[in-house]
Amino acid sequence: PWSHENPYLYQLEITLTDSEGEVTEVVPYKIGFRDFILDPTDRVMKLNGERLVICGVNRHEWNAASGRCISLEDMKWDIECFKRNHINAVRTCHYPDRMEWYTLCDEAGIYMMAETNLESHGSWQKMGAVEPSWNVPGSLPEWKEAVVDRARTNFECYKNHPSILFWSLGNESYAEDDIAAMQQFFKEKDDLRLVHYEGVFHNKAYEDVISDMESRMYAYPQEIIDYLENDPKKPYLLCEYMHDMGNSLGGMNSYMELLDRFEMY
């Protein structure tokens, strides 16, 4: 089965015929087979029957010279950088990426969190405090179909990529009925992947209907320990941490060593 260690892909040939049986189009496509579940017996994420250990990064589409216009060579360089640094997973922060990136991750065995392009943290944070009175999309009916359509577009474009293990509902957009509707869409369409969303941490009233995992940003190691040692309902995933600029990134081992202590991390 497909995995980071063995990203084997099969060559599928899709043939389209007309009503007379004549071939009108032939499309080659690479596919992979793998089994990914959240085991209900121990609440551990498992790929092909084994615990999934994620050593991942967030990746923006960015080139220092060309800005957000990146090339195929830029993407291949990133894959090589991942391999050199033992990185096995990537989050497409905070929007879908170029289609070639998903194929490269299929071929390289990079586990992907495919994020939907939704971010609105300016609408529910005031001077750094959580204050959702202006929250968008929130539970506003006029926004519901718009955000569900973004989830639908993300799903329909990339649903056949074995590298995608997680659908992400977006980034820093709080959590109310509209984001719950996005979760419901993915659950109805795809039972082979998990759904991720960090923003529900700020509105626990929705924790049972949004996100298959407890997701956090920039939590201290002790906060992670406190969660995992107190009968956690969900596995724990840090979707952002160690945001490093300049001469930084010290103390990373305090996070990594928790992988050996907690199977739900």
Enumerate the predicted regions with their spans:
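Substrate-binding/catalytic cleft of secreted carbohydrate-active enzymes
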Residues: 80-82, 89-265
